[in-house]
Amino acid sequence: MARKSLIQRERKRQKLEQKYHLIRRSLKKEISKTPSLSDKWKIHGKLQSPPRNSAPIRLHRRCFSTGRPRANYRDFGLSGHVLREMVHACLLPGATRSSW
């Protein structure tokens, strides 16, 4: 189980990303549309003004049940070992064990 502070920090980053998403997207469109390099540099400076944690690259997918940041399956929102336990216990409909 991940520490609660790490999970809360990740939620805070998600809220910041949602808040500044439209601003970042509009600035990126402006950069792609402007032909002059000096104007692009000015807009790029504006792009750096929002908080660092509002960037989407800083987000991590976390396991829904344990909060583990690694080995997450996007389809289920679970980490690998929790997914395996739930499949073995038949708690995930449609998921089957494979062996070859």
Curated annotation (Swiss-Prot):
Subcellular location: Plastid, Chloroplast
Cited PROSITE patterns: RIBOSOMAL_S14
Keyword Zinc: no
GO cellular component: chloroplast; small ribosomal subunit
Predominant subcellular localization, coarse grouping: plastid
Alphabetical GO biological process terms: translation
Assembly with partners or alone: Part of the 30S ribosomal subunit.
Protein name in the entry: Small ribosomal subunit protein uS14c
